[in-house]
């Protein structure tokens, strides 16, 4: 992902075909049948293939291990590993014009020596959310559950539904297109769940997004009411969820109970 304003006009690099779908009305997305679909989907991937890490250049592995280990722990936790299959994580020493991106089942992280471990993990989780969106919820498996999320706020890829406000999105970056809305909301749910829920109590749209991840992806108590934020104040506006400070040690301790 990137923080540059000009990226408003760019979409996530992905091989997913962009097309118009007939989506469920938002108020219908939490019906009993949909919850059964989510359970079936979780079972379908229960024995999914693992993930692999790759380093560029090859001799960068030793230097990067402290970074890759924290993302490894995240992917290995019971809350997450059910959705991981055939995933490749590339750790690059060199910088690029973005900190991370996801394409073709590969998450690529760039210039990590210039990132704190907290920012590295937040960006990696954001990119993993794109993997969940594009591949775990892929259309050919039962049906594309991502469309239920898009239908909450979006008419098409970059066209919002009428009447929506800034407060109906978790960040400025989430407002750029439906894919970034999904990834930013996923990251917010994992790292700042209590914060997310507090805001959702003031926005029906945000509450639907919060409940979407609660119903379709996470078990009922995974991350719920957890908050790894360092600052207690809940801000009205965030530009980028990956820039919000959080306590990485508390997060890793929370994940370890599932590893």
Which residues are covered by each model-predicted region?
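Active-site-flanking segments in enzyme catalytic domains
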Residues: 80-259
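N-terminal low-structure segments adjacent to metalloprotease catalytic domains
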Residues: 1-62, 188, 211, 217, ...
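Auxiliary, metal-adjacent structural segments of Zn-dependent hydrolase domains
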Residues: 39-107
């Amino acid at each position: 992902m990137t923080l540059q304003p000009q990226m408003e006009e760019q979409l996530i690099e992905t091989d997913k075909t962009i097309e118009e779908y007939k989506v469920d009305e938002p108020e219908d997305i939490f019906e009993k049948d949909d919850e059964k679909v989510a359970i079936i989907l979780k079972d379908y991937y229960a024995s999914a293939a693992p993930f692999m890490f790759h380093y560029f250049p090859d001799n960068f592995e030793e230097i990067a291990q402290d970074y890759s280990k924290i993302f490894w722990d995240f992917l290995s936790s019971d809350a997450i590993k059910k959705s991981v299959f055939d995933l490749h994580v590339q750790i690059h020493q060199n910088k690029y014009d973005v900190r991370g991106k996801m394409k073709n089942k590969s998450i690529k992280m760039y210039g990590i020596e210039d990132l704190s471990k907290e920012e590295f993990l937040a960006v990696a989780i954001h990119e993993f959310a794109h993997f969940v969106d594009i591949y775990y919820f892929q259309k050919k498996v039962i049906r594309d559950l991502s469309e239920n999320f898009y239908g909450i706020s979006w008419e098409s890829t970059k066209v919002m539904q009428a009447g929506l406000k800034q407060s109906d999105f978790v960040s400025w970056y989430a407002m750029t297109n439906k894919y970034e809305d999904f990834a930013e909301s996923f990251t917010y749910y994992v790292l700042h769940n209590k914060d997310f829920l507090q805001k959702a109590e003031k926005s029906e749209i945000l509450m639907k997004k919060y409940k979407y991840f609660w119903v379709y992806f996470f078990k009922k108590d995974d991350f719920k009411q957890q908050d790894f934020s360092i600052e207690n104040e809940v801000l009205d506006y965030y530009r980028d969820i990956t820039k919000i400070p959080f306590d990485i040690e508390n997060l890793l301790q929370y994940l370890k109970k599932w590893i």
